[in-house]
UniProtKB/Swiss-Prot annotation:
Listed NCBIfam families: pdxH (TIGR00558), PRK05679.1 (NF004231)
Residues that, per the record, bind substrate: R10, L11, N12, Y13, K68, Y125, R129, S133, R193, L194, H195
E.C. code: 1.4.3.5
Name used for this protein in its record: Pyridoxine/pyridoxamine 5'-phosphate oxidase
Quaternary structure annotation from Swiss-Prot or TrEMBL: Homodimer.
Lineage: Bacteria, Bacillati, Cyanobacteriota, Cyanophyceae, Synechococcales
Source species, domain of life: Bacteria
UniProt pathway annotation: Cofactor metabolism; pyridoxal 5'-phosphate salvage; pyridoxal 5'-phosphate from pyridoxamine 5'-phosphate: step 1/1; Cofactor metabolism; pyridoxal 5'-phosphate salvage; pyridoxal 5'-phosphate from pyridoxine 5'-phosphate: step 1/1
Reaction(s) the record says it catalyses: pyridoxamine 5'-phosphate + O2 + H2O = pyridoxal 5'-phosphate + H2O2 + NH4(+); pyridoxine 5'-phosphate + O2 = pyridoxal 5'-phosphate + H2O2
One of the protein's GO biological processes: pyridoxal phosphate biosynthetic process
Cited InterPro entries: Pyridox_Oxase (IPR000659), Pyridox_Oxase_CS (IPR019740), Pyridox_Oxase_N (IPR011576), Pyridoxamine_oxidase_dimer_C (IPR019576), Split_barrel_FMN-bd (IPR012349)
Organism of provenance: Synechocystis sp. (strain ATCC 27184 / PCC 6803 / Kazusa)
Function: Catalyzes the oxidation of either pyridoxine 5'-phosphate (PNP) or pyridoxamine 5'-phosphate (PMP) into pyridoxal 5'-phosphate (PLP).
């Protein structure tokens, strides 16, 4: 391919390091610190993350989603349960997450088991969404083949009419998943590709931290 050589594209990471003495003892606390710093830096969609699942054939499948909840139980995102990722997570309830904050030269990897969140939590979040997003959850048969864009627009118009001047309930096929981590890795870019990698592993209910070679 013509253009700039991919082999020549590289940055030298110089913003900082990741030293054990400066890292929180609990990975959720450290993640919260980094997420708040990404928000303060006004990065675009700092809660965006790659979600990796397994297909029916056992192949890895990745896509970007948004983190919408975080507490001591895990990382929460919302989707159509009948979508490809929803069906994959139901069949194989394990997932990997990756957060990439390029401007801060940081990455976080999360591996864990997946569960559906309580319907009441999904109801509460759904009611906080903009009305257009609520209607979109009804109108889109996510991951299914549609004839054209007009089919989606017609679906949206139909649901707009049905719920005109009414509150919109959460579709039964839409809700949240929680990734319950057993491993969280924090990566900080460093010069000469000698990056910092600190990994937390959950063993017998306790988090253990170790340094990995880059």
């Amino acid at each position: 391919m013509d253009g700039v050589s991919l082999a020549d594209l590289r940055l030298n990471y110089t913003q900082g390091g990741l030293i054990e003495a400066e890292v929180a003892d609990h990975p959720f606390a450290q993640f919260h610190i980094w997420l708040q710093q990404a928000i303060a830096a006004e990065l675009p969609e700092p809660n965006a993350m790659t979600l990796s699942t397994l297909s029916e054939e056992g192949h890895p499948v990745g896509r970007m989603v948004l983190l919408k909840g975080l507490d001591e139980r895990g990382f929460v995102f919302y989707t159509n349960y009948d979508s490809a990722k929803g069906q994959q997570l139901t069949a194989h309830p394990w997932a990997g997450l990756v957060f990439w904050w390029a401007a801060l030269e940081r990455q976080v990897r999360v591996d864990g088991q997946v569960e559906k969140i309580d319907p009441a939590e999904s109801d509460a979040y759904f009611q906080s969404r903009p009305r257009g997003s609520q209607l979109g959850a009804w109108a889109s048969p996510q991951s299914r083949i549609v004839g054209d864009r007009q089919e989606l627009e017609d679906n949206l118009a139909r649901w707009e009419k049905q719920y005109e001047n009414q509150s919109i309930p959460r579709p039964p096929h839409w809700g949240g998943f929680r990734v319950i981590p057993h491993r969280i890795e924090f990566w900080q870019g460093r010069p000469s590709r000698l990056h910092d990698r600190l990994q937390f592993n959950l063993l017998d209910g306790q988090w253990h931290r170790q340094r990995l070679a880059p």
